[in-house]
Amino acid sequence: MAKDKKDPTILITNDDGITSPGIRNLVEAVKDLGKVVVVAPDKPQSGMGHAITIGKPLRFDRVDLYEGVEMYKCSGTPVDCVKLARDKILDRTPDLCVSGINHGANHSINIIYSGTMSAAVEAAIESIPAIGFSLLDYSLEADFSASRKYARIIVEQLLKSPPDKHCVLNVNIRIETAVDIKGVKVCRQTYAKYEEDFIER
């Protein structure tokens, strides 16, 4: 389906890489809601936080993974992806930046380390409202169907009623079927931290 020039532009990125199941499900969820442009790392970049590439070339290449979706893989971090999209790839400021769907939770201190959430924060710094989606499942067989459904619902709502241009939403979706999820609850970030264990060799 051809996109009208008035259709909203949705920038999609992540930190798990351009071939990850999370970004594939996110693209499938929202690709008919506007002009979707994907700029994502060419390899996993989890835990990169707000890092940017300095001192070496930053490259991006067009890839064709999903029909009708403009996609680019980037050699840099998730934040690099947002910066490149804004300055070199997109011909206008996107209406929304959507990051994810992350393979694992992003809450409490995780959001500081998370490339998924840092990409969303970078977008908001650049006056692009943003959402970071995460599935609370770390298994290799994670089922993204419920997160795909709720990602679409939330993106649709924000396109209809745009938030402040510096708004960032952090959405964590439980490991349940779409039928079992009763709705969306807005809450503050919890306080928690990891107990690290270093192995000396």
Give each language-model segment a name.
Residues 2-10, 21-88, 92-93:
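A cross-family phosphate/adenosyl-ligand binding-site feature
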Residues 124-146:
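Glycine-rich phosphate/pyrophosphate-binding loops
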Residues 13, 39-41, 99-102, 133-134, ...:
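Short beta-strand segments
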Residues 85-91, 118-129:
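Alpha-helix C-terminal capping segments
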Residues 105-114:
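Glycine/threonine-rich flexible loop motifs
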Residues 12-19, 110-111:
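Short, glycine-rich nucleotide/cofactor-binding loops
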Residues 145-201:
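Electrostatically charged, flexible surface regions
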Residues 96:
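Short, Asp-centered acidic motifs that coordinate Mg2+ and/or phosphate
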